[in-house]
Design a protein with these regions (language model features):
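A short beta-loop-alpha structural element at the N-terminal edge
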Residues: 2-16
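A generic "binding-loop/recognition-motif" signal
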Residues: 12, 67, 110-111
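Active-site rim helix/loop that mediates acceptor-substrate recognition in acyltransferases
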Residues: 19-51, 55
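Conserved beta-strand in the GNAT
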Residues: 46, 53-63, 67-75
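Conserved glycine-rich acetyl-CoA-binding loop
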Residues: 54, 77-88, 100, 117
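Conserved acetyl-CoA-binding loop-helix of GNAT-fold acetyltransferases
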Residues: 82-95, 107
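Conserved active-site alpha-helix within GNAT-family acetyltransferase domains
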Residues: 103, 109-135
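C-terminal "cap" of GNAT-fold acetyltransferases
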Residues: 128-154
Length: 154
C-alpha cells in the first residue's frame, strides 16, 4: 500500500477517533475523547492511502515540557498494519520534535518491541514527572499504570 503523511484536517477527527477506539478496544492504547481530539488536532499527523485517500493511521506529538515531547495516540488500521505506516508516523513525529529544538521524545506504550526497533529505550516513569501530573493523574488506571515508558534521545 502506498500512503502519504499529512497534517490533520477537521474532517479527520471522526476517523481518528474510530482508529483510536478500535485500538483501545484491543487494549493497545488508551482511548481519547472527541473533546481531547479537537483540542489537540494540531498535534496529529495522519497516514492517507494514496489510492483511496482514506486515513489509515494517526499519531500525535505532544510537547510536555522544555526539551521533552511525547509520541502518543499511534493507531494504524488493521488493513494497513505491517506496511511501515506506524514506523513512518513515529519517525515524522520525532522529526517534528527536532524542528522545535526538542531532543528527548518519550512514549507510554504496550508496544515495547515496536518502539525498541525505532531506537526507543525503556526508562523509569520517574523521569517523566510532568507527564504523570498533567495526564496520568486523570487516567482511570492511575496509579497502577501498566504501560511501559520509553524514550529516544536525539
Amino acid at each position: 500500500m502506498a500512503f502519504v503523511l499529512r497534517k490533520t484536517k477537521m474532517t479527520d477527527v471522526r476517523t481518528i477517533h474510530r482508529l483510536l477506539m478500535d485500538c483501545a478496544s484491543k487494549k493497545l492504547l488508551l482511548p481519547r475523547s472527541y473533546t481531547e481530539l479537537y483540542a489537540h488536532l494540531r498535534d496529529f499527523i495522519v497516514a492517507e492511502d494514496a489510492e483511496t485517500a482514506n486515513v489509515v493511521g494517526c499519531c500525535a506529538l505532544s510537547i510536555t515540557w522544555e526539551g521533552l515531547a511525547e509520541v502518543r495516540s499511534l493507531a494504524v488500521a488493521e488493513e494497513a498494519q505491517g506496511q511501515g505506516v506506524g514506523r513512518r508516523l513515529v519517525e515524522a513525529c520525532v522529526s517534528d520534535a527536532l524542528t522545535f529544538g526538542i531532543y528527548k521524545v518519550f512514549t507510554l506504550t504496550y508496544q515495547v518491541d515496536f518502539f525498541r526497533r525505532l531506537g526507543f529505550q525503556e526508562v523509569s516513569k520517574d523521569v517523566l514527572p510532568q507527564k504523570v501530573w498533567a495526564d496520568c493523574i486523570k487516567c482511570p488506571q492511575f496509579p497502577e499504570c501498566d504501560e511501559t515508558a520509553m524514550m529516544i534521545e536525539l
